[in-house]
């Protein structure tokens, strides 16, 4: 076969393979057997091997994998991948519905539309396409940053490597030339494919459930092995700035035209009754058996322009909620009750259980939350209890089976002193928790603070696990997190099971953490009430730790998502001698204690403004223009209302311009918009 014939055959095979992928994953109407599909793919791989210059990044042959990835770089998400608020109560679904409707502009309250869709139990990922070609796949991570797993994502057959419906009846890639778009969704494994995967593994290496199998597979270094494990990508979000597409349902339809599988079961609901019927229907279908795992229903406001109006909190959008199906329950027996001490001194009772299967995993521990809960449930040693798993990592005890209680058992004795250091416990007024007040001298608190400091969302020190932290603190080598940076391989080798190589690796991991982002350092400090989102807001308001240390309670209270309680906590933390000493050690070690200097606009001319673009702009794409507004403190919305501050119009503007003028909204040309942008300078 000469090169001209090879080109024609490669094109034919690619088109056929893409078409069969689409029929199998999107339409669920396969035309050929797996054997026939594999034969075509093998022929394509062989031809591209013979003519390597004809191989392209969007060829189906790229799904075969085979490359080895030594690490997965961290990447920033264009927009945060927020988690959804969730509920297990159908009544709370109704409250969500009425709350959202009440927030809508008056003209939309009589006819609200919500989209109900299945909540697949998988792993959230983000796909980035440039000029219609897949260029990046990333995990959700902490919502702001994730891991680049592009090589593994390429192996998933339901992920289009090139946008466009292979059947020839959809959107062409031309629509996205010169543009970047983002598609988000869930990767999951069907029950059948999960069973096949586990069948080929030793008993001790089998995965507990399809979700765990999916999460583990996506982080494998060998993409060839990933390609052999069948996974499915279901798309649920498209970042699309087109003025013609104003509803979530339309975006789902566009995703299908672009070659994505969307689940095909979404429904536009116009009343609360519609929503309840959808939920009830899928609860029944779930009990009769589905080919995949779903753990709930997601409800989203359909109108994307109204979504922009409602916005989001630091954790979740206001216009969506996840209804989780009723939690699974199981019976087991309490072996013992232990009292754990957290990094802030909180005493938490935990039940050690007879191992039992629950929600696809083996459970041997269950939280009892607090000592008041122990008294309320009247939990006793050797009781038979009902445990429930409702999305928590550790299940909870919800009731005692009293008819199975042994005669003569006694109530749990509430400890009077800390199980770690022996300090008398205290219980602040109006709180349910008991605390150990010995924050400086309690070994359990010190260990928990070090573990928090090293955790992935904080300093991400690989290899610094619970067992090593236990030895470091018990030996006196580490008193606070700052001491970690003074460790040497020789010191670490004095610990149990620490050879020269592992000691060197740990020292290198600690050294690497010096360059973690400033907001993660703030989170790692373990300040009461300061989570990762609040740490990010504090870092934005106070770009150096010195500035933050000097801030007053009043000034801190003005920071987004920081109220008086958090402000008091932050202010008090930086006035503790132990915190000051630790920070000095971190400073000496070269840990980043200020935000990275970046270029900033010299003005905030769009600060707090809601801006709309209409018509074709000459100098910018719509996404570029929107980004410039965001950088200068504003936000873009999709529809004109009395709350809109500015409309920028280009060639052939639509009805938005006319509506803006009727409402008295300020309108400007692209040239005037460019003047408003001003110059961009440096903060150095």
Curated annotation (Swiss-Prot):
Its cofactor is Mg(2+); Mn(2+). NAD(+) binds at residues 34-38, 83-84, 117, 140, 186, 300, 324. DNA ligase that catalyzes the formation of phosphodiester linkages between 5'-phosphoryl and 3'-hydroxyl groups in double-stranded DNA using NAD as a coenzyme and as the energy source for the reaction. It is essential for DNA replication and repair of damaged DNA. It comes from Chlorobium phaeobacteroides (strain BS1). It catalyses: NAD(+) + (deoxyribonucleotide)n-3'-hydroxyl + 5'-phospho-(deoxyribonucleotide)m = (deoxyribonucleotide)n+m + AMP + beta-nicotinamide D-nucleotide. GO terms for biological process: DNA repair; DNA replication. GO terms for molecular function: DNA binding; DNA ligase (NAD+) activity; metal ion binding. Residues 601-684 form the BRCT domain. Belongs to the NAD-dependent DNA ligase family. LigA subfamily. InterPro entries: BRCT_dom, BRCT_dom_sf, DisA/LigA_HHH, DNA_ligase, DNA_ligase_AS, DNAligase_adenylation, DNAligase_N, Hlx-hairpin-Hlx_DNA-bd_motif. GO terms for cellular component: cytosol. It is an enzyme of class 6 (ligase). Zn(2+) binds at residues 418, 421, 436, 442. SMART domains: BRCT (SM00292), HhH1 (SM00278), LIGANc (SM00532). Pfam families: BRCT, DNA_ligase_aden, DNA_ligase_OB, DNA_ligase_ZBD, HHH_2. NCBIfam families: dnlj, PRK07956.1. This is DNA ligase. The gene is ligA. The active site is at 119 (n6-amp-lysine intermediate). Gene3D superfamilies: 5' to 3' exonuclease, C-terminal subdomain (1.10.150.20), 6.20.10.30, BRCT domain (3.40.50.10190), DNA ligase/mRNA capping enzyme (3.30.470.30), Helix hairpin bin (1.10.287.610), Nucleic acid-binding proteins (2.40.50.140). HAMAP family: DNA_ligase_A (MF_01588). Keywords: DNA damage, DNA repair, DNA replication, Ligase, Magnesium, Manganese, Metal-binding, NAD, Zinc. Its EC number is 6.5.1.2.
């Amino acid at each position: 076969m000469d090169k001209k014939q090879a080109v024609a055959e490669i094109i034919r095979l690619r088109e056929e393979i893409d078409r069969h992928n689409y029929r199998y994953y999107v339409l669920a109407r396969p035309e050929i057997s797996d054997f026939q599909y594999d034969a075509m793919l093998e022929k394509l791989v062989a031809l591209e091997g013979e003519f390597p210059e004809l191989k392209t990044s969007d060829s189906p042959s790229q799904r075969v994998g085979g490359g080895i990835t030594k690490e997965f770089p961290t990447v920033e998400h264009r927009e945060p991948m927020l988690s959804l608020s969730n509920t297990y109560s159908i009544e709370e679904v109704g409250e969500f519905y009425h709350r959202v409707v009440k927030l809508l502009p008056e003209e939309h309250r009589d006819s609200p539309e919500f989209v109900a869709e299945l909540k697949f139990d998988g792993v959230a990922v983000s796909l980035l396409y440039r000029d219609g070609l897949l260029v990046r796949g990333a995990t959700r991570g902490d919502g702001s940053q994730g891991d680049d797993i592009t090589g593994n994502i390429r192996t998933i057959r339901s992920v289009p490597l090139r946008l466009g419906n292979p059947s020839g009846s959809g959107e062409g890639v031309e629509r996205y030339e010169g543009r970047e778009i983002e598609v988000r969704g869930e990767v999951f494994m069907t029950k059948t494919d999960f069973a096949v995967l586990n069948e080929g593994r030793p008993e001790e290496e089998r995965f507990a459930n399809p979700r765990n199998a999916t999460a583990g597979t996506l982080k494998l270094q060998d993409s060839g092995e990933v390609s052999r494990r069948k996974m499915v990508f279901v798309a649920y979000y498209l970042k699309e700035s087109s003025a013609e597409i104003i509803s979530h349902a339309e975006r789902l339809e566009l995703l299908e035209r672009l070659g994505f599988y969307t689940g095909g079961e979404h429904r536009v609901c116009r009343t609360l009754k519609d929503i309840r019927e959808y939920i009830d229907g899928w609860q029944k279908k779930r009990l009769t058996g589905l080919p995949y795992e779903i753990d709930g229903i997601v409800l989203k406001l359909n109108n994307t322009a109204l979504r922009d109006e409602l916005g989001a909190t630091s954790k979740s959008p206001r216009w969506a909620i996840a209804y989780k199906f009723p939690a699974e329950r199981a019976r087991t027996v309490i072996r013992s009750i232990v009292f754990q001490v957290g990094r802030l001194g909180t005493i938490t009772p935990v039940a050690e259980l007879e191992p039992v299967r629950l929600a696809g995993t083996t459970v041997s521990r269950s939280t009892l939350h607090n000592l008041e809960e122990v008294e309320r449930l009247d939990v006793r040693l050797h009781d038979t209890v009902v445990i429930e798993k409702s999305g928590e990592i550790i299940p909870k005890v919800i009731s005692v089976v009293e008819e199975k209680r042994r005669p003569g058992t006694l109530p749990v004795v509430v400890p009077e002193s800390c199980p770690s250091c022996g300090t008398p416990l205290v219980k602040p007024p109006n709180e349910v928790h008991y605390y150990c007040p010995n924050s400086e001298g309690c070994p359990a608190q010190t260990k928990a603070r070090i573990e928090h400091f090293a955790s992935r969302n904080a300093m991400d020190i690989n290899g610094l696990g619970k067992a090593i932290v236990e030895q470091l603190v018990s030996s006196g080598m580490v008193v606070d997190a700052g001491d970690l940076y003074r460790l040497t391989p020789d010191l670490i080798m004095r610990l149990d099971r620490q050879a020269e190589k592992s000691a060197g690796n740990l020292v290198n991991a600690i050294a690497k953490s010096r360059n973690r982002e400033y907001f993660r350092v703030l989170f790692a400090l373990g300040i009461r009430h300061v989570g990762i989102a609040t740490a990010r807001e504090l870092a934005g308001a106070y770009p150096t730790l010195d500035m933050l240390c000097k801030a007053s309670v009043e000034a801190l209270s003005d920071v987004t998502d920081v109220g008086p309680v958090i402000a008091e906590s932050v202010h008090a933390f930086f006035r503790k001698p132990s915190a000051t000493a630790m920070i000095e050690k971190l400073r000496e070690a070269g840990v980043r204690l200020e935000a990275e200097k970046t270029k900033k606009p010299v003005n905030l001319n769009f600060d707090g403004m809601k801006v709309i673009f209409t018509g074709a702009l000459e100098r910018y794409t719509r996404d570029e223009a929107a980004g410039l507004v965001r950088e200068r403190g504003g936000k873009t919305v999709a529809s004109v209302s009395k709350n809109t501050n500015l409309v920028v119009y280009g060639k052939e503007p639509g009805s938005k311009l006319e509506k803006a003028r009727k409402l008295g909204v300020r309108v400007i040309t692209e040239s005037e918009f460019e003047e408003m942008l001003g110059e961009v300078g440096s903060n150095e």
